[in-house]
Amino acid sequence: RLWGSVAFVIGSALTGKLVSMFDYRVILALLTLGVASMLLGFLIRPTIQPQGASRQQESTGWSAWLALVRQNWRFLACVCLLQGAHAAYYGFSAIYWQAAGYSASAVGYLWSLGVVAEVIIFALSNKLFRRCSARDMLLISAICGVVRWGIMGATTALPWLIVVQILHCGTFTVCHLAAMRYIAARQGSEVIRLQAVYSAVAMGGSIAIMTVFAGFLYQYLGHGVFWVMALVALPAMFLRPKVVPSC
């Protein structure tokens, strides 16, 4: 995940610079280049195949999935709120900041700053959170979310935007690390199934749904949409799993 973040830093800074030099049509060219590169990457087969003992296939019917959700609903609700609260940021922060007078390149650098903070936390996570449970880390992420989205709704002053972007390491990275720690503590095939649900629901579904709502809210509330995102993150403080086994 760390190296994906490094690539994002380079890509966001480069895109902002190119948009400033040319126009927004360069985004389509970069997207096309990126998709073509991904296709070439998919065509390269790994030279070393994964090895391991075969495992007995466990039931993965609807009953197993429903049981998984019932057992982990607090965790799933918590991460959905925390990740879903990023929807307004992902969808409208660039528009919001440019309307406040920032250039496309400045917006690109701000986005890069957030992911630089993310990379640093990923790299130091073993040392920083060695004694923290997933429950503790989710609390940290929720607090960062309320603070970050509240600041975004209150000001567009550059010093505060720098703080906002540094807090990305708390709102996203710490939440993701907490999720990985929680999932890794499961047993057997539950790890795989819970990872799949987390990726589909928290990292995908919640952001998609919240982006739709954020669009309507941004149209009518403007910067007030970020205050709403702060309220979305707030309940996560109280929905954290009661007991989370340590890794």
Q: Where do the language-model regions lie?
A:
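Intracellular juxtamembrane helix-capping segments at the cytosolic ends
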Residues: 173-187
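Juxtamembrane intracellular "pre-TM" segments in multi-pass secondary transporters
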Residues: 42-83
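A late C-terminal transmembrane helix in Major Facilitator Superfamily
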Residues: 192-221
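Symmetry-related core transmembrane helices of the 12-TM Major Facilitator Superfamily/SLC fold
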Residues: 26-44, 224-242
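Structural signature of the two symmetry-related core transmembrane helices
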Residues: 32-33, 136-151
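Helix-to-loop junctions at the C-terminal end of transmembrane segments
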Residues: 18-20, 120-134, 218
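Helix-loop junctions at membrane interfaces in 12-TM secondary transporters
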Residues: 153-165
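Helix-loop boundary and gating motifs at the non-cytosolic
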Residues: 71-112, 176
